[in-house]
């Protein structure tokens, strides 16, 4: 055992030494600029030339200079201030020491030659001043010679440099190698990522599959003894954001193998043959560092199905890359510890040869998480965040069906941003609710001014959706209803979807009814319709088409699938023109029938719809519980009063006060109920019986409107008068009877209004 450990340690040290040398060479090639040596050589030549030609100018550049007039210059010469005068270009220059500093006096000549200026010549002769004539600026003949030969020198140096790089390019690639296109740009992860399998939640099935891959790399003997062969490739499938790349990072973090990461788009370049060369280079590096894992993200970039036909030549380069990948994966030996891990969300476009057994033996589907998976993901992403006590991640998971891991991480991040906007580091439940609405529907526009007519229309529209959601069997319950504009929507009704593996026919028809609820409510309540139902009608038509064309639930056409083929190269229609016409007629029939059923349901429950509209206009946002309370018979005014009492109690800041207030409200309601029961048992008035009957007719108890006859009301009125004669000696009974009469009159009026609305309503022309 000890010898075996020593051999493993020695082998591991040898691998580390090779990796270190390879890394150092790559760093040297990356840090060294391709033109660094040549540019340094040119820089030295230019610096020497500049110093040689302009050393006098450099010396005089830092001296103090004073330009004086020609007359003053002659005067100073006559006075003997100048001991030496230099003639250069068109200037006369003289250097004088003043107060310990060298001062340079100069003036322009008035003639081309200083010998033609008698004043200067006379002054120089009197004071015996030395006169010098300097070379013109610019270097003269040497600079002219250098200007002719310097370009040739530069060209020769560049050719020598490129020749050396060509020799080096045939031996290896890198940033400085002009022939390094064939080298793969793989990123070898030497430092293990911090991501572990415990950091990946909601995809337990996929984790178990990948744990076996990691275990094989750690304990290969356990599998080889049983005659098992390691999967040569593992393909991660799933919609975007489900955690495929995160699972690959977890594999890299858990396994002790070398991990190579590359994207599918990095194989193909502008030169022919580069992709295949990079595939070969990638697998060579992986074999040198085995046991190893190659992770190819977005493999559909190179693994797309090979085309056939005359126009297939445009994809030759990509197909060569794919062919080389197929050869490399099929060329593994059984004892080679190299596993290919790939991820894609487009399995349908992959080439069948890539998916066959022996290449990608195992396919791991990473689905969207269920309820428990979403709860686990939320817990993982909330580890580094402070959550308030009122936060319930289970409730957030319930209202986010279909959210994947990336969506849930973004949700918590948006909630944290909203908390920071409040200058707080604690996330509240309100922040999470706002984040859900923001991600699902867009940014809220609470400050937007809406006209009263539009606000009323929005209230009817959303109330229609809510009522139909609660009263339609098979529909999901309501979670929230709002008329606050958000994104492109003026308002929305958020359902609380249940986890479903399959969808029944009744559920699909229920979805159509719910979608039509908004338009039907507008048509009945406002006797007009708006463009707000555009998306609802579009979605309802899509559901109806799937009902007939895809899942074969139409009774007329039967269980037949009429969808077009997914093959992009198939142009043969799969149904006749007559069948297309029958499909369109069946879709229209379904939509018309469900719209008619929606109109009937809203007419029969119009009082409940009006109560929801009233509550929406006053609160703008209501919960699903409040909608269900209205359907159960509670009034909008009672709900508003209860909300106001609760808000006042919360503002006092005492939990005890809140509890006492709620208890007192409950006790008062219980007392009223007891008193009503005693009153009912003692008096048994026919008037109260009439009130109960009217409440049942108007739908306050959740029942459906039943047709009523005028004689029933006359009979109840006679019984009411008789009851008044029997109880005329009791003041309390008279008062209660009076209240009952008022209530009956109001209920009677509402019932008459409802019947009048039903009698006056006209069906749309397309339904007549």
UniProtKB/Swiss-Prot annotation:
The keyword Signal does not apply. Residues 715-731 have a biased composition (Acidic residues). It is a multi-pass membrane protein. Binds 1 zinc ion per subunit. Keywords: ATP-binding, Cell inner membrane, Cell membrane, Hydrolase, Membrane, Metal-binding, Metalloprotease, Nucleotide-binding, Protease, Transmembrane, Transmembrane helix, Zinc. It comes from the Bacteria. Its main location: membrane. Zn(2+) binds at residues 461, 465, 536. This is ATP-dependent zinc metalloprotease FtsH. The gene is ftsH. ATP binds at residues 238-245. NCBIfam families: FtsH_fam. One of its GO terms (cellular component) is plasma membrane. It holds the Pfam family FtsH_ext. The active site is at residue 462. Its cofactor is Zn(2+).
